[in-house]
Swiss-Prot record:
The lineage of its organism: Archaea, Thermoproteota, Thermoprotei, Sulfolobales, Sulfolobaceae. Belongs to the NAD synthetase family. Mg(2+) binds at residues 45, 147. It catalyses: deamido-NAD(+) + NH4(+) + ATP = AMP + diphosphate + NAD(+) + H(+). Catalyzes the ATP-dependent amidation of deamido-NAD to form NAD. Uses ammonia as a nitrogen source. ATP binds at residues 39-46, 142, 171, 193. It is an enzyme of class 6 (ligase). GO terms for molecular function: ATP binding; glutaminase activity; metal ion binding; NAD+ synthase (glutamine-hydrolyzing) activity; NAD+ synthase activity. Pfam families: NAD_synthase. This is NH(3)-dependent NAD(+) synthetase. GO terms for cellular component: cytoplasm. Gene3D superfamilies: HUPs. Homodimer. GO terms for biological process: NAD biosynthetic process.
């Protein structure tokens, strides 16, 4: 990552923490909910989001939802975070999702890796919302800005949440925030992975490390630099810059509500624009 970009992405993390904790707390209160529920995988994003949630409210619950493709290391790391946030046994639930996923796969009659992986992500979303309804909690998402921009999430899976506290922080920034919050270095440095199948890593699928990805995203979409400029500044081939830019463009549908075909004078989303928490 160019030093120029690193400096731009380095924030006042005590202030960021204070702001995000307050926003989580206020959103829960304004929504009329009693607390928040979160899925913890043992990765950097869910670890940081869990710490922030625990600082925002005592009323939190953590779901660990491993499958046969979940590395043991991830579960070990998840328990490190449970200890860090002082989560007693009443504050977390472990559910192996393999039986749920198997039933969906049987119904669909597929062994396709991608389809099965998306079923896993959507099964976790269903469980999170079931527990959220049980406790009258909000579902707190764990996605970061890098993943959201790239579309590197499952639509109505890990993308199906009520709030995204980390949604305006690049992966590089989430790692910085994690260090500030005391997240163990093994988690901070671990290669990100949705673990939807064995051996899956985000950087392996995308073809670049996140520091490079974040540099491209920042320079293209926040500083509006040209692809040629970015290629020179980040020292990566132009085709890789274009690949990242294309990933952002083709995933726009994941970041928007479903398209409504306009027939009236005032249609929802395009004209019907009221506050998210409208009272």
């Amino acid at each position: 990552m160019p030093e120029y970009v690193r400096e731009k992405l380095t924030l006042n993390f005590p202030l960021v923490t204070e702001y995000l904790v307050k926003r989580i707390k206020d959103y829960i209160n304004n929504s009329g909910k009693s607390g928040g529920i979160i899925g913890l995988s043992g990765g950097i994003d869910s670890s940081v989001a869990s710490v922030l949630l625990s600082k925002a409210t005592e009323n939190f619950h953590v779901l660990l939802m491993p499958s046969s493709s979940t590395p043991k290391e991830d579960l070990d790391h998840a328990f490190m975070i449970l200890r860090l946030i002082n989560a007693t046994e009443s504050k977390y639930t472990i559910i192996n999702i393999d039986p749920i996923v198997d039933q969906f796969r049987l119904a669909v009659k597929t062994n396709d890796k991608i389809i099965s992986g998306n079923i896993k992500a959507r099964s976790r979303m269903i469980l999170l919302y079931a527990f959220a309804q049980k406790f009258n909690y909000l579902v707190v998402g764990t996605g970061d800005k890098s993943e959201l921009m790239l579309g590197y999430f499952t639509k109505y899976g890990d993308g199906g949440v009520d709030i995204l506290p980390l949604g305006d922080l690049y992966k590089t920034q989430v790692r910085m925030l994690g260090r500030y919050l005391g997240v163990p270095e093994d988690i901070v440095k671990k290669p990100p992975s949705p673990a939807l199948w064995e051996g899956q890593t985000a950087e392996g699928e995308i073809g670049l490390d996140y520091e490079t990805i974040d540099s491209i995203l920042y320079l293209r979409f926040e500083e509006m630099r040209s692809e040629n400029e970015i290629s020179a500044l980040v020292n990566v081939p132009i085709d890789l810059v274009r690949r990242i830019v294309r990933m952002v463009k083709i995933s726009q549908h994941k970041r928007l509500p479903p398209e409504i075909f306009r027939l009236s004078g005032r249609s929802i989303n395009s004209d019907w624009r009221y506050p998210r928490q409208w009272a």
